């Protein structure tokens, strides 16, 4: 049984890496010494015996090269181990396979048994008092779901452990061909010096060594080493780029540092906003170098560009669409959109007075650059609470941490710099101050901040459930969450929907439209019997639990499945509820389309 301890494994890997590096250093020195003998001038060492000896040491140079390649492969493998564990999310894990396969498995079975016995005992008790006080037995559905989830996690951990173990052993075995070749090639080198008492370097037969079957494999071994080291080098480069990009996303406000990292990552590996930001900072530095603006302004522009660039990809959208949820992290009560706007506008006004009216060259350049970027991308469209944050409204309205890691890859920041000709220059004593009409910018920020969405544009989300009684061969269950606007009112349309598992997304209508295309447009797909799928209200309530069902069955059993409500009681008689359901249905099928795309 395996015992996996990440700390010990990484400690030993680091220790062994250092040992291999020391061995490599010694091999390089040894190779140098061999080459010095092999390259002795004829004036120093000549004759047939001397030539044989020099050729013999030249052969040792080749063997030493093979050793260095092998050591490099070992170092590359050991150095990448921490990243391998991190990718497997096991960089700090301690796992005993026997515990997972025996103790936990037994505990799972025992827990199920105990719950079953307790439920049976409770049922007997309730039956005894049923004539006095009829009571329903408690549900074990939630318990079973959580127990099943825990057992699933146990099994996945075992699989992950075995996969990691197999992957590491497989990669470690990559050096075995090199090791075998070195041993056999070195043996052949020794044998080429003769036999018995005549086995000395002076009798070395270079031709016999070069033409031996084992030595002819040298080229293949070198290609193998080169290919492996090339892959490991590329992996290391990708990890470095990933770490540097994370650093850019986390926050680098110094222009010099931002440019240095951007160039190291390579513009081709940056997000569009990061490329734009790097280019703009370079332009600002060029102007500073030409003496057109001061370094304080350059630094302010750089920070402002970083501010707006980061906000563009983290977004005011999330904050505005659900201010209550976002602000609750700060201990605030849920806020009405009007109050949200009041908070934003107050923050904008305060930052304007602080950084523009009473600021210096640095703060003014930063504020204007930020403001232009905010207006250019229409604050609420792709920016967010982080945007207000960067205009020094930060702590007042946004929990920055809740926005981390979100990206909008297709955002392109326009020309944000304050000296761009398309913006008006504000003049002081008839001298261009290198800023735009900031008062007008402030007004535009306030105008955009009024466009507060209400949460109805956010895509639906669905969380899978596993009720024990569900026929899992035919259906899945999802808790759908979302909001729609019906007759001017924002309505929460969250509900459970039981989804058919045999929908063929490639099935076509008579007009050649696939089910996936239908769903993308918000329309119901077709079942395999050729009838369109109906969303049936199980308890005839809107909103309420629903079932996907072929229209053929919906029609066939209509009298049975609609007995809960009379025609006069149908929610469809309520204009708001009817509009609410129609909006839900369209948005729901779009969610299903996205779900199918993610699965494939």
UniProtKB/Swiss-Prot annotation:
Protein location:
Secreted
Which positions fall inside the LXG domain? 1-235
Q: Give the GO cellular component terms, alphabetically.
A: extracellular region
Any idea which UniProt keywords this protein has? Coiled coil, Hydrolase, Nuclease, Secreted, Toxin
Keyword Cytoplasm assigned to the entry: answer is no
Cite the PROSITE patterns for this sequence: LXG (PS51756)
Instruction: Tell me its family.
Output: In the N-terminal section; belongs to the LXG family.
What is the protein name for this chain?
Answer: Toxin YobL
């Amino acid at each position: 049984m395996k015992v996996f301890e990440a700390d010990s494994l990484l400690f030993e890997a680091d220790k062994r890496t250092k040992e291999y590096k020391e061995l490599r250093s010694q091999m390089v020195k040894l190779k140098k010494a061999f080459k010095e003998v092999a390259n002795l001038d004829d004036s120093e060492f000549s004759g047939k015996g001397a030539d044989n000896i020099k050729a013999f040491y030249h052969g040792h140079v080749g063997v030493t090269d093979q050793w260095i390649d092998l050591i490099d492969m070992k170092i590359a493998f050991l150095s990448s181990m921490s990243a391998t564990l991190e990718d497997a999310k096991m960089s700090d894990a301690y796992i005993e396979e026997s515990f997972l396969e025996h103790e936990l498995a037994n505990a799972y079975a025992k827990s199920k048994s105990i719950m079953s016995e307790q439920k049976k005992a409770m049922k007997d008790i309730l039956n005894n008092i049923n004539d006095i006080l009829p009571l329903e037995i408690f549900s074990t559905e939630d318990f079973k779901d959580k127990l099943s989830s825990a057992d699933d996690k146990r099994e996945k951990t075992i699989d992950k452990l075995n996969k990691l173990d197999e992957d590491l052993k497989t990669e470690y075995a990559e050096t075995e061909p090199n090791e075998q070749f070195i041993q056999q090639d070195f043996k052949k080198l020794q044998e080429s010096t003769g036999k018995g008492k005549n086995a000395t370097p002076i009798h070395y037969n270079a031709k016999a060594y070069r033409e031996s079957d084992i030595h002819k494999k040298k080229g293949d071994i070198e290609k193998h080493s080169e290919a492996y080291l090339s892959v490991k080098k590329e992996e290391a480069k990708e990890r470095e780029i990933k770490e540097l990009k994370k650093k850019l996303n986390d926050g680098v406000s110094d222009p010099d540092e931002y440019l240095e990292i951007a160039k190291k990552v390579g513009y081709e590996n940056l997000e569009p906003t990061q490329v734009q930001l790097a280019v703009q900072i370079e332009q600002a530095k060029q102007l500073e170098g030409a003496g057109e603006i001061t370094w304080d302004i350059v630094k302010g522009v750089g920070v402002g560009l970083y501010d707006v660039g980061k906000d563009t990809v983290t977004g005011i959208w999330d904050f505005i669409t659900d201010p209550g949820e976002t602000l609750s992290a700060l201990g605030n009560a849920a806020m009405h959109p009007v109050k949200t706007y009041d908070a934003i506008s107050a923050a904008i006004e305060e930052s304007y007075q602080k950084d523009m009216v009473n600021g210096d060259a640095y703060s003014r350049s930063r504020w204007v650059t930020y403001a232009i970027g905010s207006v250019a991308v229409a604050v609420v469209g792709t920016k967010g609470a982080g945007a207000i944050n960067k205009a020094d409204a930060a702590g007042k309205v946004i929990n920055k941490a809740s926005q981390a890691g979100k990206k909008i890859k297709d955002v392109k920041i326009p020309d944000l710099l304050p000296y761009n000709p398309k913006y008006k220059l504000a003049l002081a004593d008839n001298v261009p101050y290198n800023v735009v009409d900031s008062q007008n910018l402030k007004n535009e920020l306030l105008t955009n901040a009024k466009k507060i969405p209400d949460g109805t544009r956010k895509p639906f989300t669905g969380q899978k459930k596993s009720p024990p009684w569900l026929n899992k061969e035919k259906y899945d269950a999802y808790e759908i969450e979302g909001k729609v606007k019906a007759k001017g009112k924002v309505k929460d349309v969250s509900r459970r929907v039981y989804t058919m598992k045999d929908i063929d997304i490639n099935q076509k209508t008579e007009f050649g439209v696939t089910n996936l295309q239908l769903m993308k447009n918000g329309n119901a797909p077709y079942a395999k019997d050729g009838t369109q799928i109906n969303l049936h209200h199980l308890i005839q309530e809107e909103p309420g639990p629903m079932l996907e069902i072929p229209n053929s069955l919906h029609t066939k059993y209509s009298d049975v499945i609609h007995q809960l409500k009379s025609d006069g009681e149908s929610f469809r008689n309520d204009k708001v509820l009817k509009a609410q359901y129609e909006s839900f249905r369209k948005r729901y099928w779009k969610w299903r389309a996205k779900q199918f795309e993610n699965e494939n």
